[in-house]
Amino acid sequence: MSGAELIIQEINREAERKIEYILNEAREEAEKIKEEAKRRAESKAEWILRRAKTQAELEKQRIIANARLEVRRKRLAVQEEIIRNVLDEVRKRLQEMPEEEYFESIKALLKEAVEELKEGKVRVYSNERTLALISSRIEEIRDYLGSISIEIGSAISTMGGVIVETEDGRIRIDNTFEARMERFEGEIRAKIAKVLFGG
């Protein structure tokens, strides 16, 4: 074999070695890229999964919170309706109170107002039924109240009770059933709620 052929063979071998080296480098790089891509894909998949779980949990909490609010709203609506019905029944019973019981109630309301006004002469307003009852039993009321002069005022629109004012009309105590129920409605509601709903 001539010297030229030997040189050519050596060149070919060197070229093959270089090609093999380059191919190995390329394969390794490709493997690294594949591994990195796989790692990134897995990492992204985990992130997507975590985000989906977080969103699902948030949605679950939102649905539960909304459901609780809806239950509470419906419970309060039912509670309010029951309380309203009870208050309506109280009003109805006050209007239908037997006369003797009603008279005792009027005496107590008059006494409360007179004691608050601290006046020797007062004027009383109420509906026609109540004014007629007071007029027909005025002596009994005077005995009950003590040395108080009572003037019967004009009839007003009320389901019961009395308005009592000083002779000059400057101070007025509204002891009608409506006014008293309005004043004590919060307390009445709380009592009804406690009895019916335990709080």
Swiss-Prot record:
Tell where it localizes: Cell membrane
| DNA-binding recorded as keyword | no
Q: Which GO terms describe its biological process?
A: proton motive force-driven plasma membrane ATP synthesis
What SUPFAM superfamilies does this protein's entry cite? Answer: V-type ATPase subunit E-like
Q: Which Gene3D superfamilies match?
A: ATP synthase, E subunit, C-terminal, F1F0 ATP synthase subunit B, membrane domain
Q: How does it assemble?
A: Has multiple subunits with at least A(3), B(3), C, D, E, F, H, I and proteolipid K(x).
What's the protein called, per UniProt? A-type ATP synthase subunit E
Q: What is the lineage of its organism?
A: Archaea, Methanobacteriati, Methanobacteriota, Thermococci, Thermococcales
Q: Which gene encodes it?
A: atpE
